[in-house]
A protein has these predicted regions:
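Non-catalytic macromolecular-recognition regions in eukaryotic signaling proteins
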Residues: 25-217
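C-terminal motif of bacterial Sec signal peptides marking the signal peptidase cleavage site
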Residues: 20-23
Length: 217
């Protein structure tokens, strides 16, 4: 039986299979999965290579949920409110060609066209001594982020913003030593520039949340 040559439509179908498989990886802690897109045989991939939570100029996974008043350690007099704000994360996204690509294949710049953040309580559940470990509602934003072909870009994004901290406190979250552990998962929607296809990729990182004392920082 004579074999039919692979047509342009066949190549496109092959690309779609690769595209679907590459876009369905699961997230992992302190980094994440990747996704790929492109045009027919030319495929470019985007990966979340690291997520580093940061607050008040320091890399930390300890999220302070409640703002306290700082006091003089000798007199006990109130000296002012402790430093407080959004807890962010430095997220690194790397744009690379598909592993089977050659040096002559076209490489695409990729644009993040939006992302969402969701929260889950980590394995082990709520500590027995905790007064509460409420579910946390995530958020979605249409922020655009460009990642040139062959390069990595690090951006500072909201990790646990003030709105989520307030939600945790108002819902009765633990504010003592029995701090619960959650994971924040970013789901990015990306598009190779000049191509109509979009794909998603994920990355997650764990954090502990309670009423941490940041006076003196």
């Amino acid at each position: 039986m004579r074999r039919r040559p692979m047509t342009q439509q066949g190549l496109k179908g092959l690309f779609l299979v690769v595209f679907i498989l590459a876009s369905c990886s699961s997230p992992s802690d302190d980094g994440g999965s990747g996704g790929c897109g492109g045009s027919e045989a030319s495929i470019t991939c985007l990966n979340v290579t690291s997520i580093v939570p940061t607050s008040l100029g320091t890399d930390t996974t300890n999220v302070d949920a409640l703002r306290d008043q700082c006091r003089d350690p000798v007199s006990g007099a109130v000296t002012g409110p402790e430093p407080f704000g959004d807890h962010n994360a430095n997220v690194t996204l790397a744009n690379t060609q598909f592993p089977t690509s050659t040096s002559t294949d076209r490489a695409f710049d990729i644009m993040i066209i939006g992302y969402s953040v969701t929260y889950t309580l980590n394995q082990g559940g709520c500590p027995a001594a905790a007064r509460g470990c409420p579910p946390l509602t995530g958020f979605t934003t249409g922020q655009s982020i460009g990642i040139p072909a062959g390069q990595a870009v690090t951006v500072t994004l909201p990790f646990v913003p003030l709105s989520v901290k307030n939600q945790y406190v108002q819902a009765g979250g633990e504010l003592g030593i029995a701090a619960p552990s959650y994971s924040a998962t970013y789901t990015f929607t990306a598009q190779p520039i000049g191509v109509n296809d979009t794909f998603t990729l994920q990355g997650s990182s764990q954090f502990t949340i309670t009423d941490f004392n940041n006076c003196g920082t």
